[in-house]
Curated annotation (Swiss-Prot):
The family this protein is said to belong to: Belongs to the DEAD box helicase family. DDX42 subfamily.
Segments forming domain Helicase ATP-binding: 281-456
UniProt record, GO biological process: U2-type prespliceosome assembly
Assembly description: Transient component of the SF3B subcomplex of the 17S U2 SnRNP complex.
PROSITE patterns on file: DEAD_ATP_HELICASE, HELICASE_ATP_BIND_1, HELICASE_CTER, Q_MOTIF
Domain Helicase C-terminal residues, every copy: 484-629
Cross-referenced PANTHER family: ATP-DEPENDENT RNA HELICASE DBP3 (PTHR47958)
EC number from the UniProt entry: 3.6.4.13
Protein name (record): ATP-dependent RNA helicase DDX42
Protein source organism: Xenopus laevis (African clawed frog)
Protein location: Cytoplasm; Nucleus
Ranges spanned by the short sequence motif Q motif, renumbered to the chain: 250-278
Molecular function terms, GO-annotated: ATP binding; ATP hydrolysis activity; mRNA binding; RNA helicase activity
């Protein structure tokens, strides 16, 4: 089979006659293609017709022929497709519907529809988010989403719970930046935080037994009675608490020390034990745990060092790998060195070794000394923990543990370290805590490491030493402190060494530099100095090579330098406890000292604490300091109020009961009783406080209601209570009783007209009971036996023969307490009340003391001339009621009117004399008509008192 390209008479196709191809267009001859390639020969450029191409280009043209062959088959397929057309069903035919459903299910998803679906889904999501936000905004007030989330504070608490030692730095650390000589800030070097010792299981360790009770009472102590022991403790100002504390001693011979220790004590110039030593040493020798609290310079150090020596000498000697027997823990390096020197002084009598372990010293030297063996280790908490972790020593042989200045260690953040040290020591150890101040919170923490402790307190907790004279200088501003110090520094150095306290390290360096410029030789001590420098400064200060030492609070505790005579608080302390320790550097061991504190007007907060500290130490408090302290609100509120106290109004009704004026309350100037016994009866004890008072109040309100709310008609007969105005109100608020019966009209002669004789006290007693008033009058009483002034006798029980001034005083009292305090009543009292100008006094002036009988006769005659139609036999309140109903004058109708009370007792009718008495009497009646009984008062007649 041959392939025929066609052309000159030859048919195109394969060389078999199976099919024929229709003739098409004649193929046009191909134009010669001009090649622009670089392979074209040079001859072709010059009109050569021969087409010379590279071999690979010819291959390419041959490929083009193959493409033509392939197109032939494509044309054949197109022709065949036109012949065999697919079946296309008609519209709406079942086959078309099946094809549609099939194509819909089998066909791929349209991209546009997929994109639109995505857009709709995203829009729906956005709408849902917007709706949720709207709901959150609507409920934002009632719902807090941050409750479930951990805020900064909760994160801090969680972090502190997971890291209990985080952020615990000594108190002497300052946050301020230090600067070099060029003024560039020095990066602060933070101290390494010391982790506490890990817990230890003491049940897995077998400790050898030891003895800790070495105290035997002296015969002189045993022979003392408990009362003598109590008196001695009171004399020494000691307070001891705890289970079975041992008796205190009063001499070194009572302690039972051997001759070697006593010789060393005498060599140290000790003459007699201090109060804390008198009680503390017996407790320590007995093997008991103790909390010792005493003022600075009271000998606390010797109180635990001497028992240590006795305790150590009873135990076996140290082996090469053994640790110490006694450990003394203190907060500062200076205190550590000082206690170490004391231990060496007293320990050399027994050839005992002591090692001081503190921060800043050579770690290698301290570890070498510990490995060689030492019975006593005086340390700071952090450095001891370092040596224990590095296996330089161990605490298995420790049986005597002392924490000096325990509250200071807890305040400095050493609580966890202190607890870990105590937990690493055997549980049956002996533990002692000493301090000058001991807050209750720190005491509670300290009791956790003690077993049945005995608390020994000398003086008040945190009080200042009375041997120290404290002087407080109040200056207007800070620069004035410098002027004050430079003027007095030479005077201070002439008496002894001077210690100047400054709060901040930068201020201490600045003050020291300024003093050096003024040619004052001094030393500087603060926490950022190297330990060698600090040791050299303290050594020079003790040797008196430098008279002045400027220091921060690192020198405030435990620094025992006897040459210090003056302490100057250039800056006030952070708290009053630090102030107590500051001034305690002087006046030690019974010596006298002076402490100056410089205050400015801005430091009123500390002034309040300072006032209490001075008062507790019996020091003088200046008026300027007290005024400055009073500027502080908490001190002003908590300060006691000096001066006279408020007088309590204590009546028969109970504490704070105040008698109401205008209701017949007793005055302090006038008595209402007729004799002395009546006043005494008013203060009879009541059977029940609340019961009597309640009943008295009920009766008082009931009587007041009946007195005030009466009939409006003047002709209405008044009830008995409306005219019972002679009974005064008692302190319990009750009304007095009145006679229950009256003598018949006309039985008594006109001259006699006596009042009730045995009217003891017009009112209730303090217990709310009725006073004794007779229920009737005697049948025949002469006027000479019962004068008119009997009812209104003085408090001392004056008889009828007293002068008329008594009537005048009582009339004044009735006018004050009986009348109402309304303006109308006061006006009537002022113009028409004749009680202050009673007829008895005026009649006494005219007749030279004729007596009250003539006054009463004249009064009765005058009253009869006025047409008041009084009956001679009736002298009580009943006549007053009938008389007021006839005359239409409401003089006796109101219980508030003092005239009604006076005339119901039968006395007011004898108060008027002559015409003057008539005018006064009528004016009184007309002025007293402003009551509830008569709504419209009548016109008042003009009297002589109107002018």
């Amino acid at each position: 089979m041959n392939w025929n390209k066609g052309g000159s008479g030859n048919k195109r196709g394969f060389g078999f006659g199976g099919f024929a191809i229709s003739t098409g267009k004649k193929e046009e001859p191909k134009l010669p293609q001009v090649s622009h390639s670089a392979f074209q020969s040079a001859s072709s450029k010059y009109g050569s017709t021969s087409n010379q191409l590279p071999s690979f280009y010819k291959i390419g043209s041959k490929r083009a022929n193959f493409d033509e062959e392939n197109s032939y088959f494509d044309d054949e397929e197109e022709d065949s497709s036109n012949v065999d057309l697919p079946y296309i069903p008609a519209e709406n035919s079942p086959t078309r519907q099946q094809l549609r459903s099939k194509t819909d299910s089998d066909s791929e998803e349209d991209p546009l529809e997929a994109f639109m679906a995505e857009v709709e889904d995203q829009a729906a999501k956005d709408m849902r988010k917007l709706e949720e936000r709207d709901k959150e905004k609507a409920n934002a007030r009632g719902i807090r989403d941050d409750i479930e989330e951990e805020d900064d504070q909760e994160a801090y608490f969680r972090y502190m719970a997971e890291n209990p030692t985080a952020g615990l730095v000594p108190e002497e650390e300052e946050d301020n930046l230090e600067y070099d000589s060029d003024g560039n800030p020095i990066a602060p070097t933070t101290k390494r935080i010391i982790d506490p010792l890990p817990p230890i299981d003491h049940t897995e360790i077998e400790y050898p037994p030891f003895e800790k009770n070495f105290y035997e009472e002296h015969e002189a102590i045993t022979s003392q009675t408990p009362q003598q022991i109590t008196e001695l403790r009171h004399k020494l100002n000691l307070r001891v608490s705890g289970a079975a504390p041992p008796r205190l001693c009063s001499s070194f011979a009572h302690f039972g020390f051997d001759e070697q220790l006593l010789h060393q004590i005498r060599k140290s110039e000790y003459t007699q034990p201090t109060p804390i030593q008198c009680q503390g040493i017996p407790v320590a020798l007995s093997g008991r745990d103790m909390i010792g609290i005493a003022k600075t310079g009271s000998g606390k150090t010797a109180a635990f060092i001497w028992p240590i020596l006795v305790h150590i000498m009873d135990q076996k000697e140290l082996q090469p790998a053994d640790g110490p027997i006694a450990v003394i823990v203190c907060p500062t390096r200076e205190l550590c060195q000082q206690i170490h020197s004391e231990c060496k002084r007293f320990g050399k009598a027994y050839n005992l070794r002591s090692v001081a372990v503190y921060g800043g010293g050579s770690m290698w030297e301290q570890a070498k000394a510990l490995q060689e063996g030492a019975e006593i280790v005086v340390c700071t908490p952090g450095r001891l923990i370092d040596h224990v972790k590095k296996k330089a020593t161990n605490l298995q042989r420790v049986t005597y543990l002392v924490f000096d200045e325990a509250d200071r260690m807890f305040d400095m953040g050493f609580e966890y370290q202190v607890r870990s040290i105590a937990n690493h020591v055997r549980p049956d150890r002996q533990t002692l805590l000493f301090s000058a101040t001991f807050r209750k919170k720190i005491e509670k923490l300290a009791r956790d490491i003690l077993v049945d402790p005995i608390r020994v307190v000398q003086g008040d907790i945190g009080e200042a030493n009375e041997d120290i004279t404290q002087v407080v200088e109040i200056l207007p501003s800070g620069p004035e402190k410098w002027t004050w110090l430079t003027r007095r520094l030479v005077e201070f150095t002439s008496t002894g060494s001077v210690l100047v306290f400054v709060t901040k390290k930068a201020n201490a360096e600045e003050l020291a530099a300024n003093l050096r410029q003024d040619d004052h030789p001094l030393g500087l001590l603060h926490g950022d100095m190297d330990q060698s420098e600090r040791n050299k400064v303290i050594s020079d200060f003790k040797k008196k090579s430098i008279p002045v030492l400027v220091a921060t609070d690192v020198a405030a505790r435990g620094l025992d330098i006897p040459s210090i005579k003056t302490v100057v608080n250039y800056d006030v302390a952070r708290d009053i406890d630090t102030h107590t320790h500051r001034i305690g550097r002087t006046g030690r061991a019974g010596e006298k000292g002076v402490a100056y504190t410089l205050l400015t007007s801005k430091e009123s907060n500390f002034a309040g604490d300072l006032v209490r500290n001075l008062e507790g130490a019996n020091q003088y408090v200046s008026k300027e300091l007290l005024d400055l302290a009073m500027q502080n609100s908490w001190f002003r509120k908590s300060r006691f109020k000096a001066g006279k106290g408020k007088k309590l109004n204590i009546g028969g009704g109970g504490l704070g009961y105040r008698e109401r004026p205008g209701l017949g309350a007793e005055s302090s100037e006038h008595g209402t009783g007729g004799n002395v016994m009546s006043n005494y009866e008013a203060f009879k004890p009541s059977g029940g406080a609340m019961g009597d008072r309640l009943s008295a109040m009920k009766s008082a309100f009931q009587s007041q209601y009946k007195n005030h709310f009466v009939a409006a008609s003047a002709s209405t007969q008044k009830t008995g209570t409306s005219s019972i105005n002679s009974g005064a109100w008692t302190s319990a608020g009750s009304l007095s009783s009145v006679p229950s019966a009256h003598p018949p009209s006309g039985k008594l002669p006109a001259e006699a007209a006596p009042p009730p004789v045995h009217t003891a006290m017009l009112g209730f007693t303090s217990s709310g009971t009725l006073s004794s008033i007779p229920t009737g009058y005697p049948a025949n009483i002469s006027s000479a036996s019962y004068p008119a002034a009997t009812l209104f006798g003085a408090r001392d029980g004056a008889s009828a023969g007293t002068e008329s001034g008594g009537r005048e005083r009582h009339s004044d009292s009735k006018g004050r307490h009986g009348d109402s305090h309304r303006p109308s009543d006061r006006e009537g009292y002022r113009h028409g009340d004749g009680h202050r100008h009673s007829s008895s006094s005026r009649h006494g002036e005219r007749n030279g003391g004729e007596g009250r009988r003539e006054s009463s006769r004249d009064g009765r005659r005058d009253s009869s001339r006025d047409g008041e139609s009084r009956r001679d036999g009736s002298r009580d309140g009943g006549e007053g009621r009938r008389e007021s109903s006839r005359d239409g004058e409401g003089r006796r109708e109101s219980s508030r009117d003092g005239d009604g009370r006076r005339e119901s007792s039968g006395d007011g009718r004898r108060e008027v004399v002559g015409d003057d008495g008539d005018s006064r009497k009528e004016g009184t009646r007309e002025a007293k008509t402003d009551t509830f009984a008569i709504p419209v008062p009548p016109k008042r007649k003009k009297s002589r008192w109107d002018s």
